[in-house]
């Protein structure tokens, strides 16, 4: 893969880590290039006080921002996540030199902290190969978050069905359970131009976490039709078909697009949740699955993915499918998404919530 390195200032620790990481990329056959020359990722060397934004022109260019911080920072997680948002990054890698660390480069006492948009936050001792192994799979992943709309939703579904009513009710319950983190206050740290840039690039009209879906068999639209909450909405306020909840009738994997059936009065800015690719794979592969819930919470003893793939990528969807196949009953189970949350399947939303009520841990377990 081709990549670019962007830097405006000098920081000995950060730049030493960057040199080691660039060399590791070169050792593995990657090529340093320029942003206009078909790159797949950018190493953005910046700082938390004056963060630099690299404005990508495509979804599948991944931004890895490198910063440093003192071990005396009171809330390192908040600092890193704010920097992640302000730099529009896929990952922030923050180096924290330990006491006695080398003043002009990374030492064996330097810790690196990884922060992702899914609220992942974990750390490990600095090692170029280990950092490379955490980042490169992300750079090689592929978003599948597009939507292709058809005005073919049967009229009997223009108003919420019993299945949509269940999604509405359980969206409210998720909100009460506290497993839908509050959206990051983007306007406190980003210009309106940057916010609109994010929304345009990732086809969003807001930021939110978690999602619900439930199967509703509509034979004239396809064999695996299901309702799913829309992208960026308040899950506690699901009400309108074509705006808050959308009917997915299939997926075009070549184009990376969910095939969405809508009523005539749909919101043209509405988009189904970025996890639609994962849910569609589940419904198509396991006919017994009637509902899927994704929450930023944890359950003890679940199988877990080994790589932090971004939400909405084919690679994350395939990782979840591989885990489901390893469980005793893929149609009624829960699997973990590393440093992210859970995907929970069941024959119905009623069944899922009866199983998880009182068992969810609201703090996601972080793993390096």
What is the role of each PLM region?
Residues 1-273, 360-368:
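Long, non-catalytic terminal segments
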Residues 52-56, 64-66, 71-75, 268-318:
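Active-site beta-strand/loop microenvironment that shapes enzyme catalytic pockets
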Residues 214, 282, 340:
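A residue-level signal for conserved active-site and pocket-lining positions in enzyme catalytic cores
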Residues 227, 292-294, 336:
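A structural signal for short, well-ordered beta-strand segments and their strand-loop junctions
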Residues 298-302, 335-343:
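Small/polar glycine-rich anion-binding or flexible loop at a beta-alpha turn
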Residues 316-331:
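A short, acidic, amphipathic alpha-helical segment used as a generic capping/interface helix at domain edges
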Residues 328-336, 366-368:
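Flexible, glycine/charged-enriched surface loops at secondary-structure junctions
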Residues 344-357:
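Divalent-metal (often Zn2+) His-rich catalytic cores of metallo-beta-lactamase-fold enzymes
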């Amino acid at each position: 893969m081709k990549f670019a390195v962007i830097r405006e200032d000098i920081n000995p620790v950060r730049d030493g880590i960057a040199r080691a990481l660039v060399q590791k990329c070169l050792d593995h056959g990657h090529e340093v290039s320029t942003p206009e020359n078909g790159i797949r990722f950018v190493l953005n060397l910046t700082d938390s006080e004056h963060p630099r934004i690299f404005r990508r022109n495509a979804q599948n260019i991944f931004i890895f921002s490198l910063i440093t911080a003192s071990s005396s920072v009171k809330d390192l997680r908040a600092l890193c996540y704010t920097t992640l948002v302000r730099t529009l990054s896929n990952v922030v890698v923050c180096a924290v030199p330990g006491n006695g660390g080398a003043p002009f480069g990374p030492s064996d006492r330097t810790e690196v902290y990884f922060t992702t948009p899914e609220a992942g936050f974990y750390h490990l001792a600095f090692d170029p190969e280990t950092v490379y192994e955490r980042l490169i799979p992300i750079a090689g992943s592929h978003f599948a978050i597009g939507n292709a709309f058809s005005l073919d939703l049967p009229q009997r579904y223009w108003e919420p069905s019993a299945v949509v009513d269940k999604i509405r009710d359980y969206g409210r319950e998720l909100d009460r359970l506290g497993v839908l983190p509050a959206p990051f206050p983007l306007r406190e740290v980003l210009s309106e131009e940057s916010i609109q840039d994010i929304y345009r690039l990732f086809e969003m009209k807001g930021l939110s976490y978690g999602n619900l879906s439930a199967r509703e068999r509509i034979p004239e639209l396809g064999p695996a039709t299901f309702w799913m909450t829309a992208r960026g909405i308040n899950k506690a306020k699901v009400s309108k078909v074509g705006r808050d909840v959308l009917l997915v009738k299939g997926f075009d994997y070549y184009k990376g697009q969910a095939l969405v059936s809508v009523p005539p009065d749909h919101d043209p800015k509405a988009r189904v949740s970025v996890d639609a690719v994962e849910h569609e794979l589940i419904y198509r592969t396991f006919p017994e699955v009637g509902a899927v819930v994704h929450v930023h919470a944890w359950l003890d003893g679940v199988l877990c993915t080994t790589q932090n793939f971004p939400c909405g990528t084919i690679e994350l969807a395939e990782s979840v499918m591989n885990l489901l196949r390893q469980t005793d009953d893929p149609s009624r189970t829960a699997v973990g998404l590393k440093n992210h949350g859970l995907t929970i399947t069941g024959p119905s939303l009623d069944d899922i919530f009866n199983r998880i009520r009182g068992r969810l841990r609201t703090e996601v377990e972080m793993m390096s």
